[in-house]
Regions:
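C-terminal functional module detector
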Residues: 1-10, 30, 167-172, 177-293
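A metal-dependent hydrolase metal-coordination microenvironment
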Residues: 2-118, 124-135, 140-163, 174-176, ...
Length: 293
């Protein structure tokens, strides 16, 4: 089963950022220009509780704008922030800020959007809460602004997501900047969509089909599952690491400087496998969890 293939091409995307229409420091026009200058192909402006709609002549050539918003809740011991990607402007009227996060997920979907759980490590989200959600299209495995130098080291949510995956909630993984200040976090990460369809419909279709990976820079070029073997091809890596619901599996970390591929034989006890590629500079790329069995 082919999961990712370089033959389909990749689009470099950021699905989480803010402008002066909410709590960002740059105008929508300047934000879009900044991301296009960094070779991003698609951008979702996700201002809080509204859908920002820049004028057509403000959108740089070569950049596809995906409608978006961010809905937020503060619970007694954690926050919940939800991205609505591809959502219609009606979301501002059809969600209830005094309701529940699940109701917000339902509202995003009712308005044609895809709901993505943002920065769960930063938000202190529990396994129980994340497993309770229904209708999510994914989760941020990495969020740039939740890490240094703009925040504490809560940008990487990978370790806390494995218990969620192990309990059957297999969520596709995004990496987004969540840019606010534009003081270094812009361009720190990307979600790489495995499609050459640059339309809004094509981008949302790739999200629906899970054809993407999350990255701080390293490339994943091929990913497949065939006869119980996970195969990955990537840019030169220091480590290629295979994670699953099993706490002890031999040979799950491949440490060979400059390696560009690895194979992993799954065991009958494993319900999912995900892969992390770590480059020599310490930056990572992550696949989504692959369902087994």
């Amino acid at each position: 089963m082919e999961l990712l293939s370089a033959s389909r091409g990749f689009l470099k995307c950021n699905f989480h950022c803010h402008t002066t229409c909410s709590d960002g420091r740059l105008s929508p026009k300047d934000v879009m220009a900044a991301y296009r200058a960094l070779d991003y192909d698609a951008l979702a402006i996700t201002d809080h509780r509204e859908v920002t709609r820049p004028a057509a002549d403000e959108i740089p050539a070569g950049l596809m704008r995906i409608p978006g918003t961010e809905l937020d809740f503060l619970l007694p011991t954690q926050a919940v922030h939800l991205l609505g990607l591809g959502v219609s402007p009606d979301i501002a009227d059809c969600w209830n800020p005094n309701g529940t996060p699940q109701q917000a997920i339902d509202s995003i979907r009712a308005c044609g959007g895809r709901a993505v759980l943002a920065h769960p490590a930063w938000s202190l989200n529990t396994t129980e809460l994340m497993c309770s959600f229904r209708g999510l299209s994914g989760v941020e495995i990495f969020n740039s602004v939740s890490s240094v130098p703009t925040n504490a080291l809560r940008g990487d949510s990978a370790a806390m997501l494995d218990p969620v995956f192990a309990n059957g909630q297999l969520l596709n993984c995004f990496a987004n900047d969540d840019s606010h200040r534009y003081e270094g976090e812009c361009g720190m990460s990307a979600t790489m969509l495995n499609t050459n369809d640059r339309s809004v419909a094509g981008i949302l279709r790739a999200i629906d089909e899970g054809r993407f990976y999350a990255t701080q820079g390293p490339e994943i070029r091929e990913l497949s599952l065939t006869d119980g073997v996970v195969h990955i091809a990537c840019s030169p890596a220091k480590y290629i690491i295979f994670y699953s619901n099993e706490v002890w599996i031999p040979n799950r970390t491949r440490a060979l400087e400059g390696q560009t591929s690895a194979d992993y034989v799954v065991s009958p006890r494993e319900s999912f496998v995900r892969v992390q590629v770590v480059a020599e500079d310490g930056k990572s790329a992550w696949t989504s969890p692959i369902k087994l069995g």
